[in-house]
């Protein structure tokens, strides 16, 4: 598929996601699957979109192997890789596989740190990790992570909010 054809395919996929709320879960999966069928069967971008459709439709056990295959290809760009990791981490949480979710999200968080400022979806990784920690019963750690993630986005009190979030985890606070 040429670059122009791939861009056209991506545009049509994006158009489907724009109307996803108007489709039934089954229609969304069918529509994305039809678009994915235009690509090779092992195409990581098509696998990723198929996983997203199943995830959105509440078919987590169908999404998981597709996310894994897309990630295993090593061909996803940093943004899609981050999205696939985040979404697979969330899927694993929904499937009750909390430790696996945490490991995957921590690995993605490390990739974000290695990429430096502006890493794709850094805050989003942290938000989903906080949900995993809540599901594990680690609510104080989850709250600290969520508040520390939020702090830079506040119009005021950024430093004090970040410091207070970190202080939640100090032994004297427990």
Please place each PLM-identified region on the residue numbering.
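TPR-repeat structural position
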Residues: 22-26, 60, 98, 139
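Amphipathic alpha-helical segments of tetratricopeptide repeats
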Residues: 32-33, 68-72, 106-113, 147-152
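Structural signature of alpha-solenoid helical repeat junctions
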Residues: 42, 80, 117-121, 157-160
């Amino acid at each position: 598929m040429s670059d122009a054809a791939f861009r056209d395919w991506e545009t049509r996929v994006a158009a489907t996601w724009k109307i996803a709320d108007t489709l039934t879960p089954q229609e969304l999966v069918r529509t994305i699957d039809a678009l994915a069928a235009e690509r090779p069967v092992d195409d990581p971008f098509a696998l990723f979109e198929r996983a997203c459709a199943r995830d959105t439709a509440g078919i987590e056990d169908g999404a998981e192997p597709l996310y894994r295959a897309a990630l295993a290809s090593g061909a996803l760009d940093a943004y899609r890789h981050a999205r696939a990791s985040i979404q697979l981490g969330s899927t694993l949480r929904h499937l009750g596989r909390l430790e696996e979710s945490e490991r995957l999200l921590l690995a993605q968080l490390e990739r974000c740190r290695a990429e430096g400022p502006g890493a794709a979806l850094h805050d989003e990784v942290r938000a989903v990790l906080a949900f995993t920690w809540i599901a594990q019963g680690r609510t104080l750690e989850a709250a600290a992570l969520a508040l520390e993630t939020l702090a830079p986005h506040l119009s005021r009190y950024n430093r004090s909010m970040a410091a207070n979030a970190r202080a939640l985890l100090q032994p004297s606070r427990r």
